[in-house]
Regions:
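Gram-negative outer-membrane beta-barrel transporters
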Residues: 163, 373-376, 481-484, 508-617, ...
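Outer-membrane beta-barrel translocator/receptor signature
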Residues: 108-110, 123-125, 136-148, 153-218, ...
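Membrane-embedded beta-barrel scaffold of Gram-negative outer-membrane proteins
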Residues: 293, 297-309, 415, 448-512, ...
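Flexible loop and strand-edge segments within Gram-negative outer membrane beta-barrel domains
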Residues: 214-235, 239-322, 353
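Surface-exposed extracellular loop regions of Gram-negative outer-membrane beta-barrel proteins
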Residues: 357, 406, 410-456, 480-512, ...
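Short acidic/polar hinge/loop motifs at secondary-structure boundaries
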Residues: 104-133
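Short, acidic, small-residue-rich periplasmic hinge/interaction motif at the N-terminus
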Residues: 14-55
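Extracytoplasmic beta-strand/coil segments of soluble accessory domains associated
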Residues: 65-104
């Protein structure tokens, strides 16, 4: 959409993830995201959620974001991931949540966003969500947290998974929305293969890929893509590991920014959509060498990509190359001491009319961390120096991280942490100059980096009751968090052009530093597994209360094209509570599943409270002439968003499973941001084959 494309590639360098039995996440789960080394979940010093395997495998998910949105405290707004209301709506330009695939960033170098349908969903083994500022570990874009997808590693025995699925869009409740005559659907064919060969399984191989097609529920908006991933690992002995990974991806897609009207919410403004054809090729190499208690890891990744615009009148084509190199040294000492240190270099070059020509960027970092573990407690201290330069304009900042964990008694774990965060604006945020229909996207080259900190205090209680037929295993977790940002960047709608007359071309979006902000809140999560007679029952739940507020609501942070001073108070639709725009105060998730004799019945619930504050200009009578229906939609959809999903699976044989599902079974309308309606109810069917 508008050429704000997201391209990425994947490198695999971590060992295979370990999850609790029967797909439910309990205290024996290990994670790598918290400290960049394997660690028991209950011993982490920060909040890390691990999605149960059943959310990945038991649901007929068309896209990986359907999995991600089940994580407690995580929301997706128009494809942008947010954690604990740390971000608003950014149109795919810039992200405060870093997306990792096997420990390497999966954000585009130009826009800093993610294209979810290119994620390796068929080979995802574990999804870890680290919450809070994580820049000391992972650098810029981890200001609000990390979502880490860990994929298959070469297996000692042959492992195969093949699936084909189709998902059909139902007609919406409002008849005028359903513009189509024939059924609309999306479908996918996926495969994943893993095995090892040779003496002592020296040679390991993983192959996986997908063909995907989406006819879309919006008029003229669809997506067709194909991708292939190959991973080779060579381990001649216990000390040395080398590997190569390649990826190719092609996508042919259309998108739309603004609706025609609320009652025509699935028809783009002026019945027009932007069309983009994207190509990517990437190659990654890694080397790991263990020398006694020391581990050396080198990763090098090269990528080339191209975006071809489908419009002559609005050329947003772009192309670029990127090089990523990182060295990590780890020293696992005696008496529970671990040392980590490393260096990072990322260089990118791109050229596009969308960004007003050619640009180059460089990112360098030095980082170090000390971890200490004893019988009942763990301590962690990390420091990172980060430097960015775009077209010769440089910025640098150190960030610090402190964390501690203490086991009060068996099953009871306390944690506390404080961490700084830092994010440099993406090239798209600084230089994008394009159009979405009659609306414009305006450049903002003078914006500054944003920084902040997060503090958290949490407790996790494990529950394990044995000796009865039912049994019980589970956990409860509570966390209080406090986050503050300086010079927070927000995507803002307003009048930024000065063409003569009253024209919509003067209005659009730009990125602005809006001053200091604060987010405080409480998060409760839990999971359990038990038996009711012969029926196995397992479930998870999460509730997040986040209060995001502006600390200087009257402070002027910009002026529009008419010279009018802009502040939080003057630009907000509802400034009465100082709530930041495009945020949810309440967010809840739940999933429950029952299994018996090859049958599995499950249900998921997702809830967001009403988005109380947006840019006031969206409801201005003048703008309503050009972008109608925003005020009407907010009046009609003012009770929040509640989605209830169901699934039914039948194991046909030892290796074949038939899965049926309904997403948004109540067929509720939702507007995740102004002038956009979420998809209606969908009904899916999937046939899967699995070996080992």
């Amino acid at each position: 959409m508008m050429g704000l494309s997201s391209f990425f590639l994947f490198a695999s360098l971590s060992s295979a993830p370990t999850v609790g039995p029967d797909s439910t996440v309990f205290l024996e789960t290990t994670v790598v995201t918290a400290n960049r080394t394997e660690q028991r979940l209950e011993n982490t010093t920060v909040s890390v959620d691990v999605l149960p395997l059943r959310v990945l495998e038991e649901k007929a998910n068309a896209r990986v974001e359907q999995v991600i949105q089940m994580a407690p405290g995580v929301t997706l707004q128009d494809g942008q991931a947010n954690i604990r209301s740390g971000s608003g709506w950014s149109l795919g330009a810039g992200s405060r949540v870093l997306i990792l695939v096997d420990e390497l960033p999966a954000l585009s170098p130009d826009a800093g966003g993610v294209l979810w349908n290119a994620m390796p969903m068929e080979a995802v083994q574990q999804v870890e969500v680290l919450k809070g500022a994580s820049s000391s570990l992972y650098g810029s874009s981890a200001l609000n947290g990390v979502i880490h997808l860990r994929t298959w590693e070469p297996s000692t025995e042959q492992r195969v998974r093949v699936s084909t699925m189709m998902e059909v869009y139902d007609r919406p409740k409002i008849r005028s929305l359903g513009w189509w005559d024939a059924p609309r659907a999306r479908s996918a064919v996926r495969f994943a293969f893993s095995d090892s060969y040779g003496a002592k399984n020296q040679h390991g191989l993983v192959l996986h890929g997908q063909l995907f097609g989406d006819q879309g529920y919006q008029y003229l908006v669809g997506d067709q893509s194909a991708r292939l991933h190959a991973k080779y690992r060579f381990k001649p002995n216990s000390k040395l590991e080398m590997g190569l990974q390649g990826q190719v991806w092609r996508s042919d897609r259309s998108s739309a920014l603004i609706w025609e009207d609320f009652r025509l919410g699935y028809t783009p403004l002026d019945s027009s959509a932007t069309h983009t054809q994207s190509d990517l090729a990437a190659l990654t190499g890694h080397l790991k060498y263990r020398q006694g208690r020391q581990l050396h890891t080198l990763r090098v990744r090269g990528m080339g990509y191209a975006n071809a615009s489908g419009l002559d009148s609005n050329d947003y084509s772009n192309a670029g190359q990127s090089l990523h190199a990182e060295y990590l040294w780890q020293y696992f000492m005696e008496q529970g001491w671990n040392l980590s240190a490393g260096a990072l270099f990322i260089g990118s070059a791109m050229n596009s009319p969308l960004f007003s020509g050619a640009h180059t960027s460089q990112n360098q970092a030095l980082f170090a961390q000390v971890d200490k573990s004893a019988d009942r407690w763990d301590l962690s201290v990390g420091l990172r120096w980060e430097s960015f330069a775009v077209d010769g304009t440089a910025d640098a900042q150190p960030v610090l991280r402190l964390g501690g964990h203490y086991q009060v008694r068996e099953g009871t774990h306390l944690r506390a942490s404080w961490a700084q965060g830092y994010r440099f604006p993406s090239i798209a945020e600084r230089f994008s100059a394009s159009a979405a229909g009659a609306l414009q996207v305006f450049p903002s080259p003078g914006i500054q980096s944003e920084s902040g900190w997060t503090a958290e205090l949490g407790i996790r209680q494990g529950v394990k009751k044995e000796g009865t037929r039912a049994g019980l295993q589970g956990y409860l977790d509570a966390a209080f968090f406090w986050t503050e940002f300086n010079q927070m960047l927000e995507f803002t709608f307003g009048k930024w052009g000065n063409l003569p007359g009253t024209t919509l071309s003067n209005y659009g979006f730009t990125s602005l530093n809006v001053g200091p902000t604060r987010i405080t809140g409480l998060e409760l999560t839990g999971g359990a597994r038990s038996y009711i007679g012969p029926v196995k029952v397992e479930g998870m739940l999460g509730y997040t209360y986040a209060l995001p507020i502006a600390l200087d609501p009257a402070g002027v942070y910009a002026t529009d094209a008419d010279g009018q001073a802009l502040s939080y108070e003057s630009t907000s639709l509802d400034p009465s509570q100082n709530l930041l725009k495009y945020r949810y105060v309440h967010n809840a998730k739940a999933d429950i599943q029952a299994s018996w004799k090859g049958w599995t019945l499950g249900s998921s619930l997702r809830y967001n409270s009403f988005m109380a504050n947006i840019d006031a200009i969206f409801t201005d009578p003048l703008i309503a002439i050009f972008v109608p229906g925003v005020a009407d939609s907010r009046y009609q959809l003012n009770q929040g968003d509640l989605f209830l999903d169901f699934r039914l699976n039948k194991r046909l044989t030892e290796r074949f499973v038939l899965q049926a599902g309904v997403i948004n079974s109540l067929n509720r309308l939702a507007s995740p941001r102004p002038a956009l309606l979420a998809e209606p109810r969908t009904v899916s069917l999937q046939l899967s084959y699995a070996l080992n």
